[in-house]
Amino acid sequence: MTEERKKILAAVTERAENFVKGFDLEFAAGYMKKREEAEAEELLIRAGELMDQTFVFADKWDMEPCREPYTLTEMEWQRTPNGDPEWIFMLNRHDYLHKLMMAYYLTGNEAYTDKLKWYLFHWMCHNPILPEGSDSTRTIDTGIRCMNWEDLILHLAGNGMLTQ
């Protein structure tokens, strides 16, 4: 990594650390465990599925719900296991990745954030920017993904979990 990139990373990390300091994460995790026990348990179940690359799109605000779980043994961002292109769009929005960050906050288990980073970097490496676009880079889904990534990257960097 060049010196200039190191400086940029250090500046981003510092800002992210200040962002994360604005949250009382210990209180929030404790509150969820104590007062929203069923929701915390469900979140950990969904995060566990994501550890195995199993996807269920059944959250309250999912635009294209799919309650059927699908496991992608090999991560393919452009393939739909059920023949519905809307499934690809849901996969590439990355809303579900917040479950891994929350599971880390609830348990302290860095395996969740390791898998979260794996998803982010795998997506970056397997989805080049093409002039003609692709099913994984539609404009609306790219906007949603960017909003999700912004929050996730702030939390990862703010917790000292990003080094590149």
What are these regions (language model features)?
Residues 1-69:
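Extreme N-terminal leader/anchor segments
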Residues 49-59, 71-79, 128-136:
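Short, mixed-charge, low-aromatic patches
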Residues 57-91, 101-109:
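Asp/Glu-centered strand-loop micro-motifs enriched in Gly/Pro and often flanked by an aromatic residue
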Residues 84-164:
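Aromatic-lined, polymer-binding surfaces characteristic
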